[in-house]
Amino acid sequence: MNKSLAKPIFLLFAIAVLIVSCSKPEAKLQKFTLDGRVQGTYYHIVYYHFDDKAATQKNLPTQTDIQHGIDSIFKAIDETLSLWNPNSILSKVNDNKETLLNQIFIDNFNSAMAFSALTDGDFDITVAPLIKAYGFANEKGSKPTGRQADSLLQYIGYKKVQIKDRKLEKQYPQTQLDFNAIAQGYTTDCISKYLSAHSITSHIVDVGGEVYASGKKPDGQQWRVAIEQPSDSIDAPRQYNTLIRLENQSIVTSGNYRKYTIENGIKYTHTINPHTGKPAKHSLLSVSVTAPTSTEADALATAFMVMGMEKAEQFMVKHPEYQAVFIYCDEDGKTKTKISEALKSKIETIE
């Protein structure tokens, strides 16, 4: 070899070795969890992100930043849609106080109106007077008689309210709104969008059972969500015998087996039929709806509990982007499960 070339080649090799040996290994994603109580229920969030040092170097939020961001989302929604916060926008609207509506209220209202129209009124946020009358809100009292429930029906109906110039207009001042069947789904979506906007695309958000799974885990596995098996008692331990795999999809479960009151030996379920003014009666114990967003899944889970299984299945034929797992009682009183065909490949049984 030409000695004049050997020395430069050796130096280049030495420099390359030095660069490789001194370069820092790429920071790896780590698993983080957030848990707490909010909106009268729990939240559980799992996400994959860099540790604080690596996140700061990459100009990404730290764990404290993420917690503060999520807390601010909960706070903004509570100040807008809470029935238990007397100073919320919703409380003021229900009290007929002239109030300028913010975008959170308008977005939820518009979504609710869209699903009311889509379900022919089976989903309806104007059922608040009936929910209060049956004692499912923060007020207690004897259950309404058939005549009393009928008298409240005149104030129920999504076509009796509208937004104009950022203010709510009611046909009757007695009409009140309840966003509980859609607000938690909306909250779940907001948190997921917040995480994704900060490059945290592998995460799962659960707000009171309204779940959204974003992307896959770093190892390539899909997120797995358990579906609760209905029980005969409110206080019975939760049991799960079914898992569903999700990716960029939401699942929301609605059921009456834990949400009811008993008066004079009569069980009143919390799902109110907006058309009759009475609790829904059918064989359906619970329904778990999958949808592109938690807002959609939340609204439809409630609507399906009003419809019953047969009508819900007919709805899904027309709208295949929505699928469901139904748990119901057959004619012999046995608990059965029926799964939409499109979901069967995603279902696992827990032994």
Where are these regions (language model features)?
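Mature catalytic core of soluble alpha/beta enzymes
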Residues: 2-10, 16-351
